[in-house]
């Protein structure tokens, strides 16, 4: 007990002696404590500090998520009021609040979960479909020579400009034919290589034939047009006219027959006769009554 000023019987020496005895008693009690007790007390103090920190972080995260959800809801309401005709946007407020678990760790997102987008980002008019090529990608590496904006290509001009390729094709056909006929080169080739060469030879021959027929048709029609203009200028024809498709076909067939040899005409007539007979037989089989 601390002495008062009125207490005359308690001297200063006695007061100091009492304080020293109390300190000695406290030191004796600390000396008697073990290291295990001190360690457990320290761990308890650290655990309390960690709990306080985790509670503070959780409260901060909750406040942050709640503020974000409120902002997103306000933005979505404003956008819905401004653009009533626009497509609905995905609300990401639920996803943001449920992203964190109770212990504060981030949740693992499922790969089958729907896509989440921010409500602040405006929705595009053209919906982007994953896996589908956009118009930008399709027109990014196109050749301007074949752009439809420049109009249709002039086939006559291109055929005239690249007519020299027919000579290369004919020389290639001749080299393939000699390769197949030659016995030495034929022994070196396998059956698969031989079949590939034969297919290439057949495709080249058919391509040359189609080009020759096309050139012949264009020449026949150009001659007919020239004769019409000449007759109109001379006064033999009143008005030049455009041919129908059926008239064009008849004119081309007549000109082809005139340019053919006798053996070629017979082959063509025989092919047409067989085709007509097969058509008639099919009609007869179809018209027969079923039993």
From Swiss-Prot:
Residues 188-215 form a coiled coil. The keyword Ribonucleoprotein applies. Residues 1-138, 174-194, 255-291 are annotated as: Disordered. Residues 89-101 have a biased composition (Polar residues). Signal peptide: none annotated. The keyword Translocase does not apply. It is found in: Nucleus, Nucleolus. Residues 125-136, 255-269 have a biased composition (Basic and acidic residues). It comes from the Eukaryota. Transmembrane segments: none annotated. Component of the 90S pre-ribosome involved in the maturation of rRNAs. Required for early cleavages of the pre-RNAs in the 40S ribosomal subunit maturation pathway. This is rRNA biogenesis protein RRP36. The lineage of its organism: Eukaryota, Fungi, Dikarya, Ascomycota, Saccharomycotina.
């Amino acid at each position: 007990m601390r002495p008062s000023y009125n207490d005359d019987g308690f001297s200063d020496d006695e007061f100091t002696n009492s304080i020293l005895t109390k300190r000695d008693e406290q030191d004796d009690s600390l000396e008697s404590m073990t290291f295990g007790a001190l360690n457990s007390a320290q761990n308890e103090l650290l655990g309390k500090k960690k709990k306080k920190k985790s509670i503070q972080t959780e409260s901060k995260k909750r406040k942050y998520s709640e503020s974000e959800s409120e902002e997103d809801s306000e933005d979505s309401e404003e956008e819905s009021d401004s653009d009533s005709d626009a497509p609905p946007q995905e609300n990401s407020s639920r996803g943001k609040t449920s992203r964190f678990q109770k212990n504060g760790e981030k949740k693992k997102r499922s790969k089958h979960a729907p896509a989440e987008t921010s409500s602040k980002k405006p929705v595009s008019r053209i919906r982007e479909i994953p896996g589908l090529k956009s118009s930008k990608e399709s027109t990014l590496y196109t050749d301007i020579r074949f752009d439809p904006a420049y109009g249709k290509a002039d086939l006559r001009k291109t055929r005239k400009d690249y007519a020299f390729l027919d000579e290369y094709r004919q020389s290639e056909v001749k080299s393939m034919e000699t390769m197949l006929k030659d016995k030495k080169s034929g022994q070196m080739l396998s059956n698969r290589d031989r079949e590939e060469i034969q297919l290439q030879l057949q495709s080249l021959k058919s391509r040359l034939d189609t080009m020759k027929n096309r050139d012949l048709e264009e020449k026949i029609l150009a001659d007919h047009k020239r004769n019409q203009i000449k007759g109109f200028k001379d006064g033999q024809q009143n008005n030049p006219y455009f041919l129908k498709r059926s008239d064009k076909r008849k004119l081309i067939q007549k000109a082809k027959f005139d340019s053919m040899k006798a053996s070629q005409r017979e082959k063509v007539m025989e092919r047409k006769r067989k085709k007509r007979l097969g058509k008639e037989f099919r009609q007869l089989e179809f018209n027969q009554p079923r039993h």
